[in-house]
């Protein structure tokens, strides 16, 4: 689900061309707090943390990993991400444009994951939620501060374990 309040703020910031912070999608966050597995084996999904007003505290229920999806230009201080991750702008003949966000979690990442996909309990890398987050750079130190970035979307899904023997590719499309 789109966090309409935060998304509207980021779009307005990007259109103003006077700000670097909150001016576009920067990273994808992953978490394991979006659902509960009941003793019966049934899965209870939580509501998304989205609203129609700007909320700088909106976040995943339990963010455990993040991956940069933005590709920096030569004139920005944005950290370089994985070359297989990117954001593509797809124009249409209609009154909309799509943003296609690709994110690959490769075999060796994240560090500390289980060797095989056989977990029977919730671990840091059994993901059941993800979100897109805006860019944020501390204006005093110049460092990128992902903890201060605005969450732009929040999706909750069936738990999926990321383990060393598995790649996970996410293709996330936002229509504007």
Predicted regions and their residues:
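Small cysteine-rich, disulfide-bonded extracellular modules of the LU/uPAR three-finger superfamily
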Residues: 1-127, 135-176
């Amino acid at each position: 689900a789109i966090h309409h309040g935060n998304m509207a703020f980021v779009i307005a910031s990007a259109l103003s061309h006077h700000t670097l912070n909150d001016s576009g999608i920067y990273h994808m966050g992953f978490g394991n707090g979006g659902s509960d597995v009941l003793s019966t084996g049934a899965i209870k999904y939580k509501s998304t943390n989205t609203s129609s007003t700007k909320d700088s505290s909106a976040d995943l229920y339990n963010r455990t990993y993040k991956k940069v999806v933005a590709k920096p230009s030569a004139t920005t201080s944005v950290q370089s991400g994985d070359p297989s991750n990117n954001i593509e702008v797809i124009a249409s003949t209609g009154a909309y444009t799509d943003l296609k966000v690709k994110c690959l979690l490769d075999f060796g990442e994240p560090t500390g994951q289980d060797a095989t996909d056989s977990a029977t309990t919730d671990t840091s890398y059994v993901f059941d939620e993800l979100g897109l987050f805006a860019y944020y750079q501390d204006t005093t130190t110049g460092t990128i501060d992902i903890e201060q970035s605005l969450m732009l979307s929040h999706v909750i899904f069936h738990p999926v374990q990321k383990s060393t023997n598995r790649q996970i590719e996410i293709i996330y499309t936002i229509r504007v």
